[in-house]
Curated annotation (Swiss-Prot):
NCBIfam families: L21 (TIGR00061)
PANTHER family: 50S RIBOSOMAL PROTEIN L21, LARGE RIBOSOMAL SUBUNIT PROTEIN BL21M
Pfam families assigned to the protein according to its UniProt record, in alphabetical order: Ribosomal_L21p (PF00829)
Gene: rplU
BP GO terms, sorted: translation
Assembly, per entry: Part of the 50S ribosomal subunit. Contacts protein L20.
Name the record gives this protein: Large ribosomal subunit protein bL21
Single GO cellular component term: cytoplasm
Length: 124
């Protein structure tokens, strides 16, 4: 099983080819390709490469599937005995990213199977 740990949208995510992930909003149009070069770790079978801080020459190629909003989070603040109450909601802007391949020095170590955007195939 091959996977990589990438830094994208202010978070670190473990990604595998053929899967999609919900990440913080990216400024890219749907169906555009997206390349991440901030790769922290790459695992290919028994070989593990750890970057300091990033793995040199490693990239993760993906495709932007859609933009959406996350679940609503309710923030309720109240001060007892003062009749002070605040109720606010927040919905995070998210981007759905489909990972197509993981490459090191231009050589793909893991690629997704032929993928349909509506029904992603999980390799492995």
């Amino acid at each position: 099983m091959s996977y990589a740990i990438i830094e994208i949208g202010g978070t670190q995510i473990r990604v595998e080819p053929g899967r999609f992930y919900e990440i913080n909003h990216l400024d890219a149009a749907p169906e555009d390709s997206y390349v991440v070069d901030k790769v922290l770790l790459v695992k290919d079978g028994d070989n593990v490469t750890i970057g300091q801080p990033y793995v040199a020459g490693a990239t993760v190629e993906g495709e932007i599937l859609s933009h959406r909003r996350g679940r609503k989070v309710i923030v309720y603040k109240m001060q007892p005995k003062k009749k002070t109450r605040k109720k606010r909601g927040h919905r995070q802007e998210l981007t759905r990213l489909l990972v197509k391949s993981i490459s090191v020095n231009g050589t793909a170590i893991a690629e997704a199977l032929e993928v349909d955007a509506k029904t992603p195939v999980v390799a492995g």
